[in-house]
């Protein structure tokens, strides 16, 4: 698969577009690492972080892309260590962010963060690190992997759905796997069935 990321309208978002009341009506804010490439969008996300922290909301962040990590490693590190409660990454991204050469070292880095870190590993499933606990999440088998576009996004949606409903982390991980499995079974990044019917 070859991908060329197009941020579209995301590049037009700035601090003035952030409505305090809309953000305060939610339990978790989800920030996208790709938007770090745009200075105005970065300012908008920093404003969201300030609002969420003042309101004791959880903040989730995805590393987005290996090259994105390479471009922003230091500022990502500062954000993760100071502001983030839930971190999403795939195996390559977490190794790049931690600058560890192997997965085991990257998991130790994730444990050192003392937060929830979800690491996807393609056909190997995923690992969710919750403070110092490491929970292995099995993949959901599909008849045929058709298109992996959107798998990480749907995985994050499933995990956050569970966390927002205060489910245990293994259940949250299973929700994430179910959502990701649905999206890789067909073309396109939108589910063809109602995800709540699958859990």
What does each model-identified segment do?
Residues 12-13, 50-54, 74, 99-199:
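Conserved phosphate-binding/catalytic region of the ribokinase-like
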């Amino acid at each position: 698969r070859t991908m060329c990321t197009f941020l579209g309208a995301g590049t037009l978002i700035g601090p003035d577009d952030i409505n305090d009341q809309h953000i305060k009506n939610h339990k978790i804010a989800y920030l996208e690492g790709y938007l770090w490439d745009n200075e105005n969008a970065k300012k908008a996300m920093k404003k969201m972080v300030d609002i969420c922290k003042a309101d004791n909301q959880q903040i989730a962040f995805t590393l987005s892309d290996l090259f994105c990590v390479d471009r922003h490693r230091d500022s990502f590190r500062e954000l993760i260590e100071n502001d983030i409660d839930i971190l999403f990454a795939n195996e390559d991204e977490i190794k790049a962010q931690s600058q560890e050469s192997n997965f085991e070292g990257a998991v130790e880095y994730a444990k050192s963060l003392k937060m929830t870190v979800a690491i996807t590993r393609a056909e190997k499933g995923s690992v969710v690190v919750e403070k110092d606990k490491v929970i292995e999440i099995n993949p959901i088998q599909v008849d045929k992997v058709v298109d992996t576009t959107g798998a990480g996004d749907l995985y994050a949606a499933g995990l956050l759905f569970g966390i927002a409903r205060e489910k245990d982390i293994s259940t949250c991980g299973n929700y994430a796997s179910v959502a990701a499995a649905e999206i890789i079974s067909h073309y396109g990044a939108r589910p063809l069935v109602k995800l709540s019917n699958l859990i």
